[in-house]
Amino acid sequence: AGAAPFDAYSGDIKLGNKGTLGSALTIITALDFTLTNNFAPTLVIGESTAGDMEFGTASLEGTVSCYFEDATMINRFLNETESALEVSVGDGSNTLTFRMPRIKINSADVGVDGPTSRIVNMSFTALRDDTSLSGSSTDTNTMFYVTKSGV
């Protein structure tokens, strides 16, 4: 039948300064990111398959929303603080961890929609990194890592 799907309750989101990760955040309401490899097939007339793949520049962009508790998250944007982000999800016995050792927060919007909780909506871009947080001693130009534990 396959493995059980990951759920929204068995995981952590950590955010810290570049090169470090803080403790798990408990104020995140949503997180989304997209990794684009920018590969392009080299197709030609008369062939049913591509002869090669052209490699483009990879990019990773995302958004994160969190409850407004204080100015900490907004200050990461205002002060242009390079940050590190780690997202772990699990199903009880397996964990999948996405690590971005160097991100730049591009916006921090706080709407005031009434008397309910205020939400900070932030966009970010992953940047190439050369710190030890990257998890590799040989690859010093990476923006994104995925690790798994369990099966």
Regions found by a protein language model. Name each.
Residues A1-V151:
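Signature of extracytoplasmic/envelope-associated structural regions
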